[in-house]
Amino acid sequence: MTRPPDDGGPPPVDDFASSVLDVVDSIPPGRVMSYGDIAEYLGAGPGPRQVGRVMAVYGGAVAWWRVIHADGTPAPGHDSVAVRHYLAEGTPLRSARPPVRVDMRRARWPGLPRDPA
């Protein structure tokens, strides 16, 4: 995807961002991964903060509520929308009231099996 630099939209999606978005697309309804889980799943390189940056820029195109902090909380300011998705998908919760918290022990998704190549 290419975009002129002055159009005011997000920057073009690079390989790392594309990989993050692919992982998020693969998270099943009712399950979650933390920013760190995604970074670890993708292997050496960028960490949780870089995953967070990708989600901040491009996350609206994917099921962003399935990517949360390691303590089970959604991105700041998104509790009320995220909890509606969690309840609709049957995501295990520790608290449906602010501060919303997902039960990471039950809801964490390990990712798709990877080729041992």
Cite the ranges covered by each PLM segment.
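Nucleic acid-binding interface residues in structured DNA/RNA-binding domains
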Residues: T2-A117
